[in-house]
């Protein structure tokens, strides 16, 4: 079975946290908020008549910046490091730099005939011909290294995005 993990950067101190759960809470005053619980944390919630959560005890939860939230891909790089959305990877044979993304994508060859794909993929951003590289993440993970992520290390993208 695939390991489900989310990570995000804490708003209070900037530390990265991860857990198997991600909770979104819509606060009328502050808008949508994102929380990642401590591992094995228990939660006490208050519900309204429609069973919507209207409040919860957030003592065991970390409020995280929504822009930094990413899911674990289920894959590791060539050194065994877990790969998450928004990680920056490097292909050492050609020095190509890419970002792990989630969504719909098309590979450069054959997808006009067979259609597109959906899931985790590599958005290649630097190199001689990044648009010619295939994007399916699983193809690359055993031969690339995770260098960082777009939130802590934007300089890794070479000013391209």
Where are these regions (language model features)?
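Secondary-structure transition motif
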Residues: 1-161
């Amino acid at each position: 079975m695939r390991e489900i993990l989310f990570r995000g950067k804490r708003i209070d101190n900037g530390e990265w946290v991860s857990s198997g759960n991600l909770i979104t809470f819509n606060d009328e005053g502050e808008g949508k908020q994102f929380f990642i619980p401590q591992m094995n944390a228990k939660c006490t919630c208050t519900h309204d008549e429609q069973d919507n959560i209207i409040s919860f005890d957030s003592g065991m939860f970390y409020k995280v910046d929504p822009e930094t939230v990413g899911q674990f891909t289920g894959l590791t790089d060539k050194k065994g490091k877990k790969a998450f959305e928004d990680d920056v990877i490097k292909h050492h044979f050609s020095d190509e730099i890419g970002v792990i993304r989630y969504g719909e994508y098309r590979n450069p060859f054959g997808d006009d005939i067979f259609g597109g794909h959906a899931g985790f993929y590599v958005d290649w951003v630097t190199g001689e011909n990044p648009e010619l590289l295939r994007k399916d993440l699983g193809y690359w993970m055993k031969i690339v290294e995770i260098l960082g992520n777009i939130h802590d290390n934007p300089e890794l993208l070479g000013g391209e995005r």
